[in-house]
UniProtKB/Swiss-Prot annotation:
The gene is Znf728. Residues 5-76 form the KRAB domain. This is Zinc finger protein 728. A zinc finger (C2H2-type) spans 81-103, 109-131, 137-159, 165-187, 193-215, 221-243, 249-271, 277-299, 305-327, 333-355, 361-383, 389-411, 417-439, 445-467, 473-495, 501-523, 529-551, 557-579, 585-607, 641-663, 669-691, 697-719, 725-747. Residues 611-636 are annotated as: Disordered. Keywords: Metal-binding, Repeat, Zinc, Zinc-finger. One of its GO terms (molecular function) is zinc ion binding. It comes from Mus musculus (Mouse). CDD domains: KRAB_A-box. The lineage of its organism: Eukaryota, Metazoa, Chordata, Craniata, Vertebrata. One of its GO terms (biological process) is regulation of DNA-templated transcription.
Length: 752
């Protein structure tokens, strides 16, 4: 034990002449250093009893009193080793050599685990216990264990409720003098320890040392279960509870339990509603000082570090350095499993969870688990339906402030991100990146099940749910389920009738914003998405994607009942109603039901008598746009869809598909009453009217009823006497187009 340090080995000695030269500043420095040296010895367990001189210093005596006490207590004789730097004397050579390391800053004792160095072997021994987890010093009252005896001594004061060190300003009492010194800094607001990289300041050197590990990336404490590394042993301890499921910190108000005490402290503020940290500029209050610090940057905008390439500004040089990597394209952090590279190590850490399947954050309401806490927080809003952030222009509410900020750009029409290829502009840079994939054709994200490729990982994630059929979001009104909460929200508007998105040109309203965006292109005439095969242009990308399947003959959506395949999922959904007999769209006037809303809209024209579509070719007004567009196709003679067997051509691919069934003999649509089969669903629908005797289309003049609107239209010509169809051979006029074909054969002498 003779080689162990004592208080007198690290004490500062002054001669009588030197004491007389000390001014108030030097006296204060002497006092602080002496108390700090004693605190270090206590921490290492090397102080058996408190010297009387230390008691004097703690009680803040006058310099003259301390001078007398130092002269009595400190013995100058018997010290053969004198330090040249500070004049201090030592009896033993080894103690003198250890003392010299303080001036030379030599740290000879290195930790083999993490590489950290120390001046004394006793400090290294105490440090090693952090790695081994050894805590040999136990509290006799509560059995809590500690690495070093000094921490045990401080802990014991909790049981004795002994706090001998009192703050003069606020009267707060503390267990030890070092805590009192630290506490005083809180009142002064002083942060003397500054980070050279980020500029961030701290009250204590220990906090600065901890902070520096962010820049160095040092994480010596590794989890044995999942391999995740941490910068501090306390964080590793908290992390381990994720695997064990242990939540020892419980809220007294609501009973919610947490892994670590800091999370509990944060949670408690929810119940109290306390926001003690106020912004001096705008008066906004916050729960935590860290959030206030981040908020203050909005007002200051000082000392911004600007990017030379794009001009983007940052508050800290570290953030600028991270940003510059985006321009260089360098992605130094690579995933060992799939080879994907990232700009930042944090992004790589998040990505790795996909491979490990670790989803430590679980929803207490529905049991769904998530990779990240932030995504769980977002998910919880689905259950609460809380949308606290409201748009001042249109009144729409959002769950997050970032989504409100993005939404506001719709009203300002500010689209700073422009595509260099086609000139299309976007509100957000992310939207521009997604758009560029259209021009490059790049689809790096592939589905493992069906092999389908996508331009973005989010699209692949959405697609994967088709295979799993996991639809956790259910409508309370009709029971329909959805993959995503956003789709459920849009669907609910069908029941409520809410259409918040209105077209400024024609006044038409829509359930969702994307439908309004597509609709607007009708007025602008914008067809941004063009088919490379046939040159046909479309308003939106999804319509182009569906159209391309006509050329590739790809039909990924198959009916489980009859095996018929379709280009688009919407077509399959419509087709399924034929088998189920579901007709959800009902006419309010006559009660007739339809499979599709478009059919109901067409049907309503019969009751209103409205004919809004005008044919430029014949000058006639028509009740349906199809009657206007189909004659145009016939007139131009355009029939691009040709049958490979007989060579017959058709205007539309749907007609070609129906025609092909003649050759293969396929009749997938069966009548449930008589068993008769048909090639297409419209023929089956017409046939069913024979059994029901239904004739919903009635002539207003003579009262005659018909099965179909086409027969009613033909019948009306009898009353009007109109003959719009002229023979090119003899010039004779006819009421029906079919009569022209018969007349041609009579005039030419052709025998049918």
């Amino acid at each position: 034990m003779e080689d162990m340090l004592s208080f007198w080995d690290v004490a500062i000695y002054f001669s009588a002449e030197e004491w007389e030269c000390l001014g108030p500043a030097q006296w204060k420095l002497y006092r602080d250093v002496m108390l700090e040296n004693y605190s270090n010895l206590v921490f290492l367990g090397l102080a058996s009893s408190k010297p009387y001189l230390v008691t004097f210093l703690e009680q803040i005596q006058e310099p003259s009193d301390v001078k007398r006490q130092a002269a009595i207590t400190v013995h100058p004789g018997g010290k053969c080793y004198t330090c040249k730097e500070c004049g201090k004397g030592f009896e033993h050579k080894k103690v003198y050599q250890n003392h010299r390391r303080i001036h030379l800053r030599v740290k000879s004792y290195k930790c083999e685990e993490c590489g950290k160095s120390f001046r004394f072997p006793s400090l290294l021994s105490a440090h090693k216990r952090n790695h081994t987890g050894q805590k040999p010093y136990n509290c006799e009252i509560c059995s809590k264990a500690f690495h070093v005896p000094s921490l045990l001594s401080v802990h014991k004061r909790i049981h004795r409720v002994q706090k001998p060190y009192k703050s003069e300003d606020y009267g707060k009492t503390l267990h030890c003098p070092s805590l009192l010194s630290q506490h005083k800094i809180v009142h002064t607001g002083e942060k003397p320890y500054q980070c050279e990289d980020l500029g961030k300041a701290f009250r204590y050197p220990s906090r600065l040392s901890n902070h520096k590990k962010i820049h160095t990336g040092e994480k010596p404490h590794k989890c044995e279960v999942c391999g995740k590394a941490f910068d501090y042993p306390s964080r590793l301890s908290n992390h381990k509870r994720i695997h064990t499921g242990e939540k020892p910190y419980k809220c007294e108000v609501c009973g919610k339990a947490f892994h670590d005490p800091s999370k509990l402290s944060q949670h408690k503020i929810i119940h109290t509603g306390e926001k003690p940290y106020k912004c001096e500029v705008c008066g906004k209050t916050f729960h935590y000082p860290s959030i206030l610090s981040k908020h203050k940057i909005i007002h200051t905008k000082e000392n911004l570090c600007k990017c030379d390439i794009c001009g983007k500004a940052f508050h800290y040089p570290l953030l600028l350095s991270q940003h510059k990597i985006v321009h260089t394209g360098e992605k130094p952090y690579k995933c060992e499993d799939c080879g994907k590279a990232f700009y930042y190590p944090s992004r790589l850490s998040r990505h790795k969870k996909i491979h490990t399947g670790e989803k430590p954050y679980k929803c207490e309401v529905c049991g769904k688990a998530f990779y990240y806490l932030s995504i769980l927080s977002k998910h919880m809003i689905v259950h609460t339906e809380e949308n606290p952030y409201k748009c001042e222009v249109c009144g729409k509410a959002f769950d997050y402030p970032s989504r409100l900020s993005n939404h506001k750009k719709i009203h300002t029409e500010d689209k700073p991100h422009k595509c260099e290829v086609c000139g299309n502009a976007f509100c957000f840079s992310s939207s521009l990146r997604k758009h560029k994939i259209i021009h490059t054709g790049e689809k790096p994200y592939k589905c493992d099940i069906c092999g389908k490729a996508f331009g973005s990982p989010s699209r692949l994630s959405k697609h994967n749910k088709i295979h799993t059929e996991d639809k956790p979001y259910k409508c309370e009104v009709c029971g329909k389920a959805f993959h995503f909460p956003s789709l459920l929200l849009v669907h609910k508007r069908i029941h409520t009738g809410e259409k918040p998105y209105k077209c400024e040109v024609c006044g038409k309203a829509f359930y969702c914003l994307s439908t309004l965006s597509v609709h607007k292109r009708i007025h602008t005439g914008e067809y941004a998405y063009k088919c490379e095969v046939c040159g046909k242009a479309f308003h939106c990308l999804s319509t182009l994607s569906v159209h391309k399947r006509i050329h590739t003959q790809e039909k990924p959506y198959k009916c489980e009942v009859c095996g018929q395949a379709f280009h688009a999922s919407s077509k399959l959904s419509h087709h399924k109603r034929i088998h189920s007999g579901e007709k959800p769209h009902k006419c309010e006037i006559c009660g007739k039901s339809f499979y599709y809303p478009s059919r109901l809209s067409k049907h309503k024209v019969i009751h209103t008598g409205e004919k809004p579509y005008h044919s430029q070719a014949s000058g006639k007004t028509l009740d349906y746009p199809s009657r206007h567009s189909k004659p145009k196709t016939i007139k131009t003679g355009e029939k691009p869809n040709k049958c490979e067997i007989c060579g017959k051509a058709f205007s539309f691919p749907s007609l070609l598909s129906i025609h092909k069934r003649i050759h293969i003999g396929e009749k997938p649509y069966n009548c449930e009453v008589c068993g008769k089969a048909f090639r297409n669903p419209s023929r089956l629908s017409n046939h069913k009217k024979i059994h029901t005797g239904e004739k919903p289309y009635k002539c207003e003049i003579c009262g005659k009823a018909f099965d179909y609107p086409s027969l009613l239209s033909k019948h009306k010509i009898i009353h009007t006497g109109e003959k719009p169809y002229h023979s090119e051979v003899c010039g004779k006029a006819f009421s029906y187009s079919s009569r022209i074909s018969k007349d041609k054969k009579i005039c030419t002498g052709e025998k049918p």
